[in-house]
């Protein structure tokens, strides 16, 4: 993933998006549906109906960037909500792009088993 500035806001456009849309079509969705400017510096994420394709639209200060990722297996976890957009943190975006359920991340090891032993 291209490193984003720490101040970048990240928005998921809820619902399914027509993945045939490119720069202009997604920019119009940002303006009309999300009521934001595609040139604000925020990153906007869109998911297709099948759930295996995601597109990210981001203005880097020089122009619009459009990134896409298609999962070979599985689907991207997407919110089911009546709102038009959901805010994510950079860590949640990283989990989303890796196919991890960013809403309820879980540890892969048990907790509460005491302190690790010291080497030596």
Regions found by a protein language model. Give the residues of each.
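Polybasic/polar functional segments that serve as interface/processing modules
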Residues: 1-120
């Amino acid at each position: 993933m291209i490193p984003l500035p720490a101040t970048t806001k990240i928005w998921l456009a809820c619902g399914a998006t027509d993945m045939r849309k490119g720069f202009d079509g997604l920019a119009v969705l940002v303006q009309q549906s999300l009521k934001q400017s595609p040139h604000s510096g925020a990153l906007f994420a869109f998911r297709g109906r099948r759930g295996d394709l995601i597109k990210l639209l981001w203005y880097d200060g020089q122009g619009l960037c459009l990134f896409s990722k298609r999962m070979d297996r599985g689907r991207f976890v997407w919110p089911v909500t009546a709102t038009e957009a959901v805010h994510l943190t950079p860590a949640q975006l990283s989990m989303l792009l890796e196919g991890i359920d960013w809403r309820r991340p879980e540890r892969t090891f048990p907790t509460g088993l005491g302190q690790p032993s010291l080497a030596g």
